[in-house]
Design a protein with these regions (language model features):
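An N-terminally biased module of ancient metal coordination in phosphate/nucleic-acid-related enzymes
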Residues: 1-95, 166-174, 178-179, 194, ...
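Short beta-strands and strand-loop turn motifs
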Residues: 8-11, 155-162, 190-195, 234-237
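Short secondary-structure boundary/capping elements
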Residues: 22, 67, 138, 214-218
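Extended, intrinsically disordered, low-complexity segments
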Residues: 263-273
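Active-site-adjacent C-terminal substructures of enzyme catalytic domains
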Residues: 167-247, 255-259, 263
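Conserved radical SAM core fold
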Residues: 47, 117-122, 199, 241
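Extended substrate/RNA-proximal surfaces in nucleic-acid metabolism proteins
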Residues: 52-54, 58-191, 260
């Protein structure tokens, strides 16, 4: 159990168009925090037709090639004696990207799976919309298929399907168990996403059950199931600004994970372990 904050693997920079700060800003912040590792994992580019259709705010493939990769390479070299800088992307699992994942992995250290869309009747639907039981099951099937592919080391906000769900029903339980079991089988780390707490407070989506605060994500019911299976867990800020690294919400989630005795890790097997 890691009980001291020493790394962060989920950060976004200005290229995604809904974050601030560049690679150097995050690296310097991590050095000041005395972290051993900082990973830059901005939202991965989509094919132009799909990005336009989804109106998804993220870098273009040209920005990825001309700005992102160069910035990461430069930071790795400049700070190699101070901190380990890892390069990555947070990206969805989509049929349209199947040929792109191996290319990304040839250029980066690792990929995070962040499934913000599911394909319903051949149309992509945002995970932040209200999902019915069948769509929750579809989310579970999609992320399990993604983990089976071997392309991803971390599953970001695995319980994000519950963003608009307060009643944790049997479908939520079944899909959660499906995801957790697959993460164990395919050696994918489950991420407790601190930004879910921030967003819950900002959007007033926190709620109470038996006088205990809960959030759409991180969702207590999900992480209680994770505890029963002892799956590997990583706490990440999902920072969209350098000052969102290691803030009061980060401390809160570390304390909660410690109380729950979750199997928290701060290194990725095969990458920096």
């Amino acid at each position: 159990m890691v009980n001291k904050i020493r790394a962060n693997y989920h950060t976004h920079i200005f290229l995604c168009k809904h974050a601030i700060g560049d690679v150097e800003d995050y690296v310097k912040k991590a050095i000041n925090l005395r972290y051993h590792t900082i990973a830059i994992t901005d939202h991965g580019p989509l094919p132009k037709f799909l990005q336009k259709k989804l109106n998804s705010r993220r870098m273009s493939i040209e920005q990825y090639k001309e700005i992102y990769l160069d910035s990461l390479a430069r930071a790795k070299e400049i700070h190699k004696e101070e901190i380990l800088v890892l390069s990555g992307l947070e990206i969805e699992y989509m049929d349209e990207l199947l040929l792109q994942y191996p290319i990304f992995l040839s250029e980066l250290d690792f990929l995070i799976l962040g499934q913000h869309y599911i394909k319903v009747n051949n149309e992509y639907k945002s995970i932040y919309s209200s999902l019915n039981d069948d769509e929750i099951k579809l989310y579970g099937d999609t992320v399990v298929r993604a983990m089976r592919s071997g392309y991803f080391k971390i599953l970001a906000h695995p319980e994000i399907f519950a963003w608009n769900i307060k009643d944790w029903n049997q479908t939520c339980i079944d899909v959660s168990n499906q995801i957790i079991d697959a993460a164990i089988l395919y050696n994918v780390i489950l991420e407790i996403n601190v930004n879910g707490v921030r967003n819950s407070f900002y959007q007033r989506k926190e709620f109470y059950q038996d006088d205990v605060i809960n959030f759409p994500y991180p969702r207590r019911e999900f992480w209680k199931l994770v505890k029963t299976k002892n799956a590997k867990v990583m706490i990440n800020d999902d920072a969209h600004a350098p000052n969102r690294m290691h803030d009061e919400y980060t401390e809160y989630i570390y304390e909660l994970a410690t109380k729950m005795q979750l199997n928290v890790v701060d290194r990725i097997e095969g990458i920096n372990q």
